[in-house]
Amino acid sequence: MSNNNDLHHPARRDFLTTAGGVGGALAIGASGVASMTLGGPMAMASALATSRYGMGPGLKGPYLDLSTGKGNQLAYARIQGDLDFGKPKYFWFKGYLMGVEPHKKVVDLMGTSGFGVIRLAQGPDGAIRRMCREIIVYTDLRSGEVLDEWKNPLTNEMVKAVHVDNDPFNYLIEEFFPAPPKFGGLNQGPPPPRVPFIMPWYQHGGWAEMEIHIHLAYPNALQPDKWPRESSGPIVQVSEMFAHHVKVEDLQNPKLTTLDYTGTWNRITPWLPWMLMGQRPGFCQYACFMGTTKNLDEILSRPVLDYAEKNYAKYFDAPTEWTEDRSLSSLEHYALRQKPAPVK
């Protein structure tokens, strides 16, 4: 959720960032591989569903060993999309955007709803291509209607709402952590070392759980000299935190080419540029549930879906071809599509 007013992840993005934080070390014990017994599949499922101290046999096999880069690559690819290449998969998120200012209570500002569609394809050298389109729509806290305008309670100014659409947001899923996103060349740095893609997995009974934390700081596409009312400053500081919950039985079932999950997406980001708060101290935080679905009608409200169908029709399907187009966050898209607001 690459909302860099943003960077999906959720990122939606940038799980891809670094192996240095959460996601760079494995929290798996030597719990051993469950073996097939005369009890058959039911006995296998029962054996996998045991855990102690956050560890269990469902993290070691029999299909995927999550202490290896290859095991994590296949697990993450099945969470993100479908290894039956070509099939699309929906993810969704729904929650709130909050405003955080120094020495003041946190304020709920608006609702946030969105979805994306992912299609996987074979990539080079064993990599898996993840091809995605995604949107974020902002809604009124009381009515749930999609915002066209919004009265900022922190400034009492009426502003035009600018929703988020990212097309594409592509990256490779490999046995190693990829390099962080470049965001059109703004996020530069030396290539990181090739670190095995091993995530911090935990097992709680029949559930496997994994978090991804992404922390970024890079030059702002909205520099304050050109965008005085929109810019949070010369450097963008963004963090995203994803939590995924999947059934151990599904995770270790080789017949399943995709995995349903539930979880949360949280994002800390500067004031959204269209809020016109400039470099005022503080920031925004997204707090959302997320998951997968075969039918968006089951999750998202009718006003959100109606708005998406009218304004973002192509976002109900994922890209079918891999492109080398720059995968930009909403902050870079804002700089390309919008004009600076007049200075008051």
Language model features by range: what are they?
Residues 99-249:
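Predominantly extracellular/secreted and cell-surface proteins with exposed
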Residues 1-11, 36-38, 42:
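N-terminal secretory signal peptides
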Residues 233, 248-267, 271-272:
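Mature extracytoplasmic/lumenal regions of exported proteins
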Residues 48-133, 321-343:
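N-terminal segment immediately downstream of the Sec signal-peptide cleavage site
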